[in-house]
């Protein structure tokens, strides 16, 4: 790990042509969405949070699963400066985004090709008939009005495998980057943190976080709130 200055980090973001962002829940806290493991996070005070987001809970205690998942929705949350600047870089073909987040804020900010590695809360479907169901309907009932099947969000639960398409797209995004920027994540959840092994030998890793990461590879570290850095970033056409 090597520390860098805020000015250096901003310069890299402003000038690099092939950036891939690996993002986590920490980038959405400025939008009012709590992260998972901080003191104010979603899991605080809840016993067995992983169980509540597991396939077993969905199948055996669907009501308990449903009541917990509903607390993860923040439909009034708006993208912040981090999402907005990343979307701008994506639209200029300079940035790609692979996100652990299921809050949909990257897409809300205008990102078209974000890889939702763990899925999206705002995409729901009926497990019985396969129909797409508006998330607004899901928040009213987890039973499909047409067939009475169980509705669920299209997110990856504990005990479930990830989408092959998401994995392939994420690997491609990392492998094509000259600069990989890790933002708002402790980078400890597998297989998300394993994506870094697909980077080019010449690619640079930059972590913008409030605590250092445990990476086996050399990386540059800026201890900062990401929203502060992205607010200072000027992107020229």
Curated annotation (Swiss-Prot):
The keyword Cytoplasm applies. It catalyses: N(6)-acetyl-L-lysyl-[protein] + NAD(+) + H2O = 2''-O-acetyl-ADP-D-ribose + nicotinamide + L-lysyl-[protein]. Residues 1-237 form the Deacetylase sirtuin-type domain. One of its GO terms (molecular function) is NAD+ binding. Zn(2+) binds at residues 126, 129, 144, 147. NAD(+) binds at residues 25, 29, 37, 100, 102-103, 118, 185-186, 209. One of its GO terms (cellular component) is cytoplasm. The keyword Transmembrane helix does not apply. InterPro entries: DHS-like_NAD/FAD-binding_dom, NAD-dep_sirtuin_deacylases, Sirtuin, Sirtuin_cat_small_dom_sf, Sirtuin_class_U, Ssirtuin_cat_dom. Nicotinamide binds at residues 102-103. The active site is at 118 (proton acceptor). It is found in: Cytoplasm. Its EC number is 2.3.1.286. Keywords: Cytoplasm, Metal-binding, NAD, Transferase, Zinc. NAD-dependent protein deacetylase which modulates the activities of several enzymes which are inactive in their acetylated form. PANTHER family: NAD-DEPENDENT PROTEIN DEACYLASE (PTHR11085:SF4), NAD-DEPENDENT PROTEIN DEACYLASE SIRTUIN-5, MITOCHONDRIAL-RELATED (PTHR11085). NCBIfam families: PRK00481.1-1. Belongs to the sirtuin family. Class U subfamily. This is NAD-dependent protein deacetylase. It comes from Enterococcus faecalis (strain ATCC 700802 / V583). The gene is cobB.
